[in-house]
Amino acid sequence: MTGNRLINFALAAVTLAAVTLLWGIPHAFKPAAVQAASLEAPHWGEGGVPQFQIDPDWPKIPSKWKVGFGSAVVGDNKGNVWILSRPRRLPKEDQASAAPPVMEFDQAGNFIQGWGGQSGAGYQWPSNEHGLFVDDDGFVWIEGNADGKSNNPADLPNDNQILKFTNDGKFVMAIGQSGQTGSNSTHILKGATDIFVNTKNNEVYVSDGYGNSRIIVFNANTGAFIRMWGAYGHTPLDTDRRPARAALKQDPWTAVSEVLQQFGSPMHDVKVSNDQLLYAADRGNKRVQVFTPDGKFLTEQFVGPDLEDLQARGLAFSPDPGQRFLYVGGTPDAWILNRRTLEILGTVKTVPKGGPVGQTGTSNIGHLLGVDTNGNLYTAGELSTVFGKTQGAYKYKLTGYSPTIPCCQAPRNISAAAASTGATEATEAP
């Protein structure tokens, strides 16, 4: 080997070592599926990063109604947008004029329909509405997260059900049993948070949630259990069996590798991309983990690890066929990521300039996210003192794309112990 070749080889080795130290093991050695997709993706959002501006006129709530706290918002394949709210969270004097918990609007904000709120044969309507999804066939899926006395304004039996309805609100099916607790059951949930229905394989993915630390999968037609898994594909542990942090404000990315081996509480959202990658929003650990739909861990990204506000609350994809951008909900801002590389490209200011931040009940925004067919972004939550009214969700109109400037911070270099995931296969139905 010549002297020049020796020098080049040494420089390459030093460069590889530096990259490994900067990104941590999971990022330095991405699995082949993610690595291949990354090579195809525009680097740093080549062509620009989406820019948004809040639309104060969306939605147009009928004047006779008051809207409870907005829990979820989602776009459907017809171009309309749905809001799930919590009527029981309204002050008592407003509950007689509460808007229905499920409402559909067009992109201009015009009201189309509303329904829900009452229990019926075979199901209990949630005490505390949480997750919402409209699948490609038009079925509407909701769930609640009341657990005993926690998040239970109506003091009803625990929610712990996924409910499937027709587009106009006729009950179809329930997954789980109301009045039960989930533990690690294959058919009962515990504080589930959101739903995604993958019509390509007829599966329902549930982020479960506040009581359990897992993704759990059911058949979309029968509700039969298929499989489940936890962080890195590990067997999930219940809340009371998870390692505890030493203190409430302990930095969860420093010397807590044992904690990181499980999803934090709550595991708050789940989405599956067009190229069949599953994204899990681990709010408890401020990260997004990526899996195959059968539970094989691929990679992860931490968002806002040094911020005190809640992060990794919700997920949404840009509507282009390649779903180039991944939006990750946070408070008070949402994050814009290159979906295939997980590089952080920028943020969306979800609280208007000069609006209140940190005041109770005024800026609990970004609870869950949605997008419509034109690429506009929506957040569920509340900005009541900004607009002087409650409306459940807010529209951020896509105004164009800006030149790409590297933003924010690189992924944290988590400890070698946490990086050594020891990923396992998902637990499947026998």
Where are these regions (language model features)?
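Eukaryotic scaffold repeat domains enriched in small/polar residues
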Residues: 7-8, 22-430
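Bacterial N-terminal signal peptides
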Residues: 12-24
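N-terminal Sec-pathway targeting helices
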Residues: 2-13
